[in-house]
UniProtKB/Swiss-Prot annotation:
Residues annotated for substrate binding in this entry: D378
Modification 4-carboxyglutamate occurs at: E46, E47, E54, E56, E59, E60, E65, E66, E69, E74, E75
Gla domain residues: 41-85
Source organism (scientific name): Bos taurus
Signal peptide residues on this chain, from the entry's feature table: 1-23
Glycosylation sites: S92, S100, N185, N243
Residue ranges annotated for the EGF-like domain, each copy included: 86-122, 127-168
Annotated protein name in UniProt: Coagulation factor VII
Amino acid sequence: MLSQAWALALLCFLLSLWGSLPAVFLPQEQALSILHRPRRANGFLEELLPGSLERECREELCSFEEAHEIFRNEERTRQFWVSYNDGDQCASSPCQNGGSCEDQLRSYICFCPDGFEGRNCETDKQSQLICANDNGGCEQYCGADPGAGRFCWCHEGYALQADGVSCAPTVEYPCGKIPVLEKRNGSKPQGRIVGGHVCPKGECPWQAMLKLNGALLCGGTLVGPAWVVSAAHCFERLRSRGNLTAVLGEHDLSRVEGPEQERRVAQIIVPKQYVPGQTDHDVALLQLAQPVALGDHVAPLCLPDPDFADQTLAFVRFSAVSGWGQLLERGVTARKLMVVLVPRLLTQDCLQQSRQRPGGPVVTDNMFCAGYSDGSKDACKGDSGGPHATRFRGTWFLTGVVSWGEGCAAAGHFGIYTRVSRYTAWLRQLMGHPPSRQGFFQVPLLP
């Protein structure tokens, strides 16, 4: 009888629940509107159980501290937390060309294999290896081949090395090197004529001094054992070539030091287009009657390839100008060889300066400007014809010839230099095939 009463009570209880079951389930639209997983506090029994990633962070929302309790390792916890809290930024495989991805907070980092670079390793370094980009990485000259891409090559007297970019001398005294410094395992370029410093003995080994009847006439640059480049205007009033000599290895004019070598000038060659009294095409090539002996204090300056000069050397900020010219406007001539570093100006700034001097000399494409607007450092009378030398990756090149200027280091005015790259082909042709006799020659420029 008692068992029947219990059975009846249980049946009544189940029937009462049946009526309330529909309230447990929500309509679809209401269910979708609350698909949000709230964070809830762990119950008493859950706190007694060891940490579970699935229970703590998948079924619920966990904190960094709760995740740390699970991993019990700071680094592993942070790796998990970045992915858990921010999503895996590497899930889309953003790194290209075999790069590996590391997830970061709201970002990622690609570690690129050799030969690739960029945010997503998308850039093939080889495709960026062009002459217009840092000279193609070449130490001296850079060329382009449509099939093989860029290639490096070297000036005469140098050989390309196994790395395909470096140039090593093949002769004892190559152009563009300073022997006394090379033997000291290198040195800093000369520090910053007017406002300049004495060029230490042997550190301007290509500097030539041109003398007329034993007196300083102009400067010049040794570009080969028997060849000196200078300025055409130096020889406008020359009456007799027989009294003109070139001295190499000179340093202190007040005494004989030993390295000096004096040679008679056999030929003076200027462009046929040069007009006396004008400033355009102000360049001259001199052949010595006998070659000088190259050595520690006498070495040539490199005559650069024109493209290299215009596309690479022209963008080197500072270059060296040297000579024995006047130390000040209307001042005394320097006793020791002076050198100064001058900055090169942009062409438009040079042309603007030219337009501000109505009736003055015109700056043409065959020239460039260099110097300081405050007039603190400059070339001066007696420096004419001397070198504007530019250093690139350890080798010096002839980029300009001291031509003209308004005063010496005059404020607001810059020095004007003949742009050697415009005459490289003409100079090389004459050095390879000089006139057959001695004298003064006017030779047309190459078309």
